[in-house]
Amino acid sequence: MLLLTEHYWFFNGGRQIPEADVNDPEYADLYGPAAGITRDMSDIYDNPPTEEHMQDWLVRTCEIVDKYQPSIVYFDWWIQQYAWKPYLRKFAAYYYNRSAQWGKETAIDAKFDAYVYGSAVNDLERGQLDHITPDLWQNDTSVAKNSWGYTIGNDYKKPSDVVLDLIDVVSKNGALLLNIGPKPDGTIPEEDAHILREMGKWLKVNGEAIYGTRYWKIFGEGPTVVPEGHFTDTYDKHFTSEDIRFTRKSNHIYATVLHWPEDGEIHIKALGNDMKLLKSTIRDIEILGTDLHPAFARNKELDISCGRGVIEAGDMPVVLKITVE
């Protein structure tokens, strides 16, 4: 459930239209009233909302919790303003205590350190991290590069782009919140549905490398740099066969090859002898979605030989399930 604090000033645009109902005093309770943008948005101490507005926000937000028992409450930006801090704490206490009464696991998503680490999920809008964090984080993004909603002429991502982002995010202890934009009649555009179906096909085969896994000692290896920060996930990432991402579960390490090589030869530095990251013995390697258990040798690197043309992955990543003992 998406909740907003920036509506204190966000209806400013409507203030420019004389006949808009945002200017009608009769609707002041609905719109805030709309304050207009007169502040420096980067200054968390600048011109805070009124006490009346923040009290009203808290009551409304708690009312939503009681009415709908949301599993996740997602706060968009501007919530990091210093004046909101006492109200954020009050809301978190109320929501988490109510969740305990319901016997339900819940979470708060927030940006820009609005909540202290460990009390909410840190969210990056259309962005990723370049490292592992011990606290769960989230990348919220969309199937289109240019829009959050249905727009004629949307610049859609490729299904493989979304899958690759998912793998990278999970390897760094993150979660992916993926948006699609329905048409006005509620139907899902075919372009959106195609991306979801292709993701589903990949996850049906390789989901065990994602669901219920944890991050490994390092998130991965390879030459391709994933930029960190908000609004960075639309940059083209040209992954190579040297780009690997790791997850783990039980006695398995999942090494996802982000671009499968034509010759079928894989070399993983982190699982070789030189880096000394893996102390266990490798018992078996399986390529998910196949019956193949390729030959391997653990030298300076972990060298895996699958043979040319054996795997036809296209632009989708391939998962190696590595069993250790």
Task: Annotate the PLM regions.
Residues 1-325:
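Mature catalytic domains of secreted/periplasmic carbohydrate-active enzymes
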